Amino acid sequence: MAQLIDGKKLAEDVVSTVKTETEKLVAATGVVPGIAVVIVGEDPASQVYVASKSRKAKECGFHSVQHDLPETASEQELLNLIEGLNNDPAIHGILVQLPLPGHIDSGRVIQTIAPEKDVDGFHFINVGKLGTGEVETAFVPCTPAGAMIMIERVHGRDLSGLNAVVIGRSNIVGKPMFNLLLAANATVTVAHSRTKDLPAIARNADILVAAVGRPQMVKGDWVKPGATVIDVGINRIPAPERGEGKTRLVGDVDFAEAEKVAGAITPVPGGVGPMTIAMLMANTLTAACRSAGMKKPVF
């Protein structure tokens, strides 16, 4: 039976470090990490995400502000707001909750955020830094950053000699995951929907990262015995056994099958998910430390 990589516990450890390092930063410099969360419209899922981010920021001792714009807000109004936040010395991290309404160009909005305040790690400058191995000065997207900490807890920081396979090539998870694994000296293959004989490629992985958004796609016989399996997927599927109309959350990996083969595995829920918000807090603290000329903490 595989070792369970407990995302809730690891996220608590990260947040605990953030709290301690925040207190040190405030004591040494008077700088309080500040995060601004911007939400446009009233999408219920976005409201839940934003509320949880704001709660966690306050728990960490941050200065946290939320800007709510109506669904009808123009792109220019949003850009003007971001420009103001870019110039606000009390704000170190800016997060625009996606998705945005259809009349707003998300790409343009994200590229307007000052790279040094881009705690989501989506600005081209941060993407480029990560792609050229400048991990120390980049902001890394929160989900792959959290997944990487989970891998490090099993294998350490140096992955020399290990084969890693990332299933999925999104800009948010797949590509940054590839770059992080490569920077840690793993030999990395990126697979996707056009990959030939995906199960055979997956079976070669000492570290298998699934980030495709297809429920339970990765079966037990895709997993190399003893491999570390990181399941980034969050999918809601019908659960008639719980009652009519009920659903449950599953990952991209068939957990029941894979758990019997893997050496270590993340559950869904309670795996990568909690790490995402924890790493957002870590990135915000890092931004504040950089602005104060202090060394960034190690998580």
UniProtKB/Swiss-Prot annotation:
Its EC number is 1.5.1.5, 3.5.4.9. GO terms for biological process: L-histidine biosynthetic process; methionine biosynthetic process; purine nucleotide biosynthetic process; tetrahydrofolate interconversion. InterPro entries: Aminoacid_DH-like_N_sf (IPR046346), NAD(P)-bd_dom_sf (IPR036291), THF_DH/CycHdrlase (IPR000672), THF_DH/CycHdrlase_cat_dom (IPR020630), THF_DH/CycHdrlase_CS (IPR020867), THF_DH/CycHdrlase_NAD-bd_dom (IPR020631). GO terms for cellular component: cytosol. GO terms for molecular function: methenyltetrahydrofolate cyclohydrolase activity; methylenetetrahydrofolate dehydrogenase (NADP+) activity. PROSITE patterns: THF_DHG_CYH_1, THF_DHG_CYH_2. Keywords: Amino-acid biosynthesis, Histidine biosynthesis, Hydrolase, Methionine biosynthesis, Multifunctional enzyme, NADP, One-carbon metabolism, Oxidoreductase, Purine biosynthesis. Catalyzes the oxidation of 5,10-methylenetetrahydrofolate to 5,10-methenyltetrahydrofolate and then the hydrolysis of 5,10-methenyltetrahydrofolate to 10-formyltetrahydrofolate. This is Bifunctional protein FolD. It comes from Brucella canis (strain ATCC 23365 / NCTC 10854 / RM-666).
